[in-house]
Amino acid sequence: MSHESKGPSKAPEFVAALKGAGFDFFCGVPCSLLKGLVSLLDHDESAHYISATREDSALGMAAGAYLGGKRPMVLMQNSGLGVSVNALASLSTMYDLPALLVISWRGEPSLNDAPEHILMGQIMLPILDLLKIPYRVLSPGTPVEPEVAWAKKEMLATKKPVALVAKAGVLE
């Protein structure tokens, strides 16, 4: 299993972009590929990060936060996307409850990852397509601020979830 770092983590820049775009509710289920992001949010008292036990529970929290006037972000490993399919299809999407999904890409086809991540790594983007969730992929060389701005604009325009998929090394 290999998760080679491809330069410094963009987690600090990402958190600044999220806050600058008005995201003010942060929850999710941690993943090692998101450890830099989780650590920053967890130690930032103004972020009020809530660690959930399941990804579908985090989506429920995000729905409530949105209804309460917040702009939510939910983080998860891509295996958590599988756990979240029903909540995304029958709650978030159906009832126009937007959230930014920040999803780590375990089992990315070009990487040597643990065997349990390989299939989900192959089918994650098609699942997002089937759910009609627009997404962008964050690579180590990708500037994050324009991607966060795109996500905010898309969420506000559609009132639906959108996703930023983080490759290994981006938010570690």
Each predicted region: which residue ranges?
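Thiamine diphosphate
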Residues: 1-172
